[in-house]
From Swiss-Prot:
Gene: TPS-Cin
Xref: InterPro entries: Isoprenoid_synthase_dom_sf (IPR008949), Terpene_cyclase-like_1_C (IPR034741), Terpene_cyclase_plant_C1 (IPR044814), Terpene_synth_N (IPR001906), Terpene_synth_N_sf (IPR036965), Terpene_synthase-like (IPR050148), Terpene_synthase_metal-bd (IPR005630), Terpenoid_cyclase/PrenylTrfase (IPR008930)
Listed name of the protein: 1,8-cineole synthase, chloroplastic
Keywords associated with the record: Chloroplast, Lyase, Magnesium, Metal-binding, Plastid, Transit peptide
Gene3D superfamilies, A to Z: Farnesyl Diphosphate Synthase (1.10.600.10), Terpene synthase, N-terminal domain (1.50.10.130)
Record's cofactor remark: Binds 3 Mg(2+) or Mn(2+) ions per subunit.
PANTHER family: OS04G0344100 PROTEIN-RELATED
GO molecular function, one term: 1,8-cineole synthase activity
Length: 612
């Protein structure tokens, strides 16, 4: 929301308070990368400054003093890798054939668990795209033995097994099979509680880990899944304190840290490579591991090329000259390449990174730098969608407008290649709704109005920018998205509303204090407190966390419901974008200050290959 005229604000506004935010420390990167990186260590405080960049008369503006770009363009352009050599691709292709044979060579003993473990391993290693047919055959086989009590380790098992059943419940549900969580009722004792022994054996711990993972794909009103999550969480927290550091303890910590909704497939693959030998001791895990490492590094070479393109786009667009905005294009690209590692989807990854960067630039213009008069002109120009509309814009806005205009049109061209039709009208409608939502927030500050929670939340679902970050990137994919399917994904569909709502709520819990420090009073927290006199910040946060928890279950249902009219593949990338953006808010606002977690994510999933 923008700082505008000096109209008096509501009593709950913070513009009359200190505009200095808390100091954020930028810690050094790991030594392997540090010598070639340079960034300006900044204290991202909020202050008032005078600028004469747009007119003869000085204009008073707020600037958030965001730290500069961490990833120097010269460094990005200097990246090189040996993994583009054909020999690596040839070796990977041979291994793909050998792994396919592994799918076909499973014996009758423990055949259900073996198939599930094989599917899980290729998915967690990030190589599942090579084995779609094998995965479907394996899961069809497992599902054919599924019953109201779950499954055992093998087709001839007399008794159902918690480990196999929990793993199957999660895996089958994620692949769209109609499986009920009621099977978990059969693993409770006579008192209706999940039972376990006093001695935590490795087998039991693995069973409870799979129960925990299954509980994260719960649908609304699945009480047994809620009970499973509570029980398994308590059990695993105790177990990890007692068992020695091992592949099992690391897997527990990783899964409890990232769960499912903030887990990134490429990050998981990087972590799982070190442990999967121990996880699949009864199979030829060496071939899987070698293939996973080769695929990781071959994709790493593609990441370097894409990152160089993105960095040139950022530099050529003139964004590097805008010192009042956040520069997070590398971080956004990292998130995109952590959820989609298909070499054919370069346009998706680059499009997502560009759209997110444009959102961030506009967020900083509307939040801090732009005046109300400028914002009205810019909003009108976006709606006209014509370069001549920039005539009355200040110089800095002219450049931004043209980059938005050219990038959106370029993305529409990419979408036409894959969808076979012009999609620019979808994009224009999304941008108009997005920019209108920003103007509404600016007007709230200008008038001193603090909206109701519901009014803020509904507008905030649009102003978050999820629709912009998703729409054009997914249209570049080789997944048919005709109008009737697209309407189920984009705003105001139920799917889009849930995703946008989750991210708006989660984002506000991470940003509201910094936003309030620079005079942006309206947030889910402040609006809830205003609607409920006497409510504390803790009350508001508890309410919002409960909302997010329930919305997550509804979101799971919208993606995975068995009678889905829209294929999971059509919604999967939009769902994964939600996971990626959610990941950035896991610890704090990773988009305003690039914290150590975000920096390490860039290093481990983009900049550094894995040792072969």
């Amino acid at each position: 929301m923008a700082l505008v005229s000096g109209a008096p604000l509501a009593s709950r506004s913070c513009l009359n308070k200190s505009l200095i935010s808390s100091t954020h420390e930028l810690k050094p990167l790991r030594r392997t990368i540090l010598p070639t990186l340079r960034w300006k260590s900044a204290t991202p405080s909020i202050n008032m400054c005078l600028t004469t960049s747009n007119s003869v008369d000085a204009v008073q503006r707020r600037i958030a003093n965001h730290h500069s770009n961490l990833w120097d363009d010269d460094f990005i352009q200097s990246l090189s890798t040996p993994y583009e050599a054909p020999s690596y691709r040839e070796r990977a292709e041979r291994l793909i054939g050998e792994v396919k044979e592994m799918f076909e060579s499973m014996g009758p003993n423990n055949d259900l668990l073996q198939r599930l473990s094989m599917v899980e391993s290729v998915e967690r290693l990030g190589i599942d795209r090579h084995f779609k047919n094998e995965i479907k055959s394996a899961l069809d086989y497992v599902y054919s033995h599924w019953n109201e009590k779950g499954i055992g380790c093998g087709r001839d098992s007399v008794v159902s097994d918690l480990n196999s059943t929990a793993l199957a419940l999660r895996t089958l549900r994620l692949h769209g099979y109609p499986v009920s969580s009621d099977v978990l009722e059969h693993f409770k004792d006579q008192k209706g509680r999940f039972a376990c022994s006093s001695i935590k054996t490795e087998g039991e711990i693995r069973s409870l880990l799979n129960l925990f993972r299954a509980s994260l794909v719960a649908f609304p009103n699945e009480k047994v899944m809620e009970e499973a999550e509570i029980f398994s969480t308590t059990y695993l927290k105790e177990a990890v304190q007692k068992i020695p550091v091992s592949s099992l303890s690391r897997q527990i910590e990783y899964n409890m840290e990232y769960g499912w909704h903030t887990n990134l497939p490429r990050l998981e693959a990087r972590n799982y490579m070190g442990d999967m030998i121990h996880e699949m001791s009864y199979m030829n895990a060496e071939k899987l591991l070698e293939l996973a490492k080769l695929e990781f590094n071959i994709f790493h070479s593609l990441q370097e090329r894409e990152l160089k393109h993105l960095s040139r786009w950022w530099k050529d667009s003139g964004f590097s000259q805008l010192n009042f905005v956040r520069h997070r294009h590398v971080e956004y690209y990292t998130l995109a390449s952590c959820i989609d590692i298909d070499p054919k989807h370069s346009a998706f990854r680059l499009g997502f990174a560009k759209m997110c960067h444009l959102i961030t630039v506009l967020d900083d213009i509307y939040d801090t730098f732009g005046t109300m008069d400028e914002l009205k002109l810019f909003t009108a120009a976006i709606k006209r969608w014509d370069p001549s509309a920039t005539e009355w814009l200040p110089e800095y806005m002219k450049g931004v407008y043209m980059v938005v205009y050219e990038t959106v049109n370029e993305m529409a061209g990419e979408a036409k290649k894959s969808q076979g039709r012009d999609t620019i009208n979808y994009a224009r409608q999304a941008w108009e709704a997005y920019i209108d939502s920003y103007m509404k927030e600016a007007e709230w500050i200008s008038s001193g109005c603090l909206p109701t929670f519901e009014e803020y939340y509904e507008n905030g679902k649009v102003s978050f920018g999820y629709q912009i970050s998703v729409l054009q990137p997914i249209l570049t994919l080789d997944v048919p998205l005709p109008h009737h399917i697209l309407q189920e994904i984009i705003f105001p569909s139920r799917f889009n509303g849930l995703a946008s709502g989750i991210l708006r709520l989660k984002g506000d819990t991470r940003c509201y204090q910094a936003d309030r420090a620079r005079g942006e009073e309206a947030s889910c927290i402040s609006c809830y407190m205003n609607d409920n006199p006497g409510a504390t910040e803790e009350d508001a946060l508890n309410h919002i966390h409960a909302m997010v928890n329930e919305l997550m279950k509804e979101f799971n249902w919208e993606l995975l419901k068995p009678d889905n009219n829209v294929p999971v593949s059509s919604k999967k990338h939009a769902f994964d974008i939600t996971r990626a953006v959610h990941h950035g808010y896991k610890y704090r606002d990773g988009y305003s200050v690039a914290n150590n977690e975000i920096k390490n994510l860039v290093i481990t999933t983009v900049l550094e290959p894995v040792p072969l």
